[in-house]
Design a protein with these regions (language model features):
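Phosphate- and divalent-cation-binding pockets in alpha/beta enzyme and binding domains
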Residues: 42-43, 66-69, 97-98, 181, ...
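Cap/insert and terminal regions of metallo-dependent hydrolase folds
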Residues: 169, 176-258
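Hydrophobic/aromatic beta-strand patches that form the interior of the parallel beta-sheet core
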Residues: 4, 58, 89, 124, ...
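Active-site neighborhood of phospho(di)ester-bond hydrolases with catalytic His/Asp-centered motifs
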Residues: 33-37, 55-65, 91, 171-176, ...
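Acidic/polar short surface loop at catalytic or gating sites that assists cofactor/ion binding
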Residues: 82-122
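Core dinuclear metal-dependent hydrolase active-site scaffold
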Residues: 1-50, 122-181, 248-258
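Residues at the starts of beta-strands that form the adenosine-phosphate
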Residues: 2, 30, 85-87, 191, ...
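Active-site metal-binding motif and surrounding structural segment of the metallo-beta-lactamase
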Residues: 39-89, 189-192
């Protein structure tokens, strides 16, 4: 299995970083897009990935840097001449909200009929705390607090990836606040962690900040690659015990996951 970062930046990133979306390539060659932000058509092109090569999409939460490109992807594949519906994996309530709050306005009326999400995607609503199998890879959803308070909470669903007969080898946090206890527990199961990391001078409180992640035990930090950061960071992750900042376009290979 391979994981390639189409981008490594935040909501406000430009072409030098792109949004923090990824492509997972299974041993079979099938590709799954992990989140689909507003700039995905450009980041895919830069990585020489044709949208028609994508087999599935996983959505972690509804911010535009994670779903803003889905309307484009839905129309691109629907009218692409191959009559192809991508598999769509996301938590069940999130899947309903994705259609009614994010996509319906642009995708319902296309001059043929009143369209539904299932006209564009082969939908797989997932139970909270559940998981799914894709191309022989087992994925487990991990509920992460992202924007909390004020009577309106937003969670993002991270992914643990592995195989049925082996320990989980990979964790992708997606967008999350700092959760030290949870990350320490996950580090006992995962050989490698890709973690949301804010590096701005002003802490937003909705993303784990570098200075918070710095307090994790060395045995956890040495498993962590940092992404979703701001440009021109003053921090030196290698010196601080992390594996580093993921670079735009960087690819990781996992030989123990098919």
């Amino acid at each position: 299995m391979k994981v390639q970062f189409l981008g490594v930046g935040d909501q406000f990133s430009a072409h030098d970083q792109y949004h923090s979306n990824m492509v997972i390539t299974a041993g079979s060659g099938a590709k799954m897009l992990v989140d689909c932000g507003s700039d995905v058509k450009y980041s895919l092109m830069e990585c020489k990935i044709n949208p028609t090569d994508i087999d599935a999409v996983y959505i972690s939460h509804l911010h535009a840097d994670h779903v803003g490109g889905l309307e484009w992807l839905a129309l691109k594949t629907y009218f692409g001449g191959e009559n192809k519906r991508l598999k769509l994996f996301c938590e069940e309530k999130l899947q309903s909200d994705l259609w009614h709050n994010s996509l319906k306005g642009g995708l319902e009326c296309i001059g043929i009929k009143c369209m539904e999400l299932s006209d564009y995607f082969d939908c797989y609503p997932l139970t909270e705390g559940g998981g799914f199998d894709w191309q022989g890879i087992q994925f487990e959803l991990v509920k992460m607090p992202h924007v909390m308070g004020g009577g309106c909470n937003m969670y993002s669903y991270g992914l643990l990836a592995g195989t049925a007969d082996k320990e989980n080898s990979l964790f992708i946090s997606t967008d999350t606040q700092f959760q030290p206890g949870l990350i320490e527990n996950i580090a006992e199961r995962a050989a490698l962690i890709f973690h949301d990391c804010e590096t701005s001078a002003v802490k937003s409180t909705v993303h784990a900040h570098y200075e918070q992640l710095l307090t994790l035990p060395a045995s956890v930090k040495n498993k962590i690659w940092l992404y979703h950061y701001q440009r021109d960071s003053k921090y030196c992750p290698h010196q601080d015990g992390f594996l580093g900042f993921v670079l735009k376009g960087q690819e990781f290979t996992f030989t123990d996951i098919s």
